[in-house]
Amino acid sequence: DGFQLVHSDARLHPHLNLEKRITVVGYMNKGWVSEDTGYLEFWTDDMKECWKQVEPKFNRVVIFENSEFSNHGIPHVNKDRRVFMYTLLCNETFYETRTKAWYKARPEEENHDLVNEIGVKRLKLSDY
């Protein structure tokens, strides 16, 4: 469905021992309109403000650094989105060596069971 909890990505690939540095997301959604939703959101570290929403328009590319402060997610999707994603991995480690994503609740989700349940399940399912 495209829904994605706000999180900062895992920093270290669990098998390759390479640090995830940069993420590139490209949108291929011809005919997308704002009612389709699926905005990529970026949040402050304290989760008090969504400082940027990116519309998944056709031919749009988003590039962002992966760090413990790059909180991002997709709150709601009305229509399937088509995206490609590329991740730059480096063999030098500048940040912490976390192999799991950190999930964070948006202000309206703070005590929401679904957020806690999905976050815990995803942490258990995947190391990257």
Task: List each language-model region with its residue ranges.
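Charged, often glycine-rich, active-site loop that binds/positions anionic groups
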Residues: 1-12
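Catalytic core of Fe(II)/2-oxoglutarate
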Residues: 11-22, 30-128
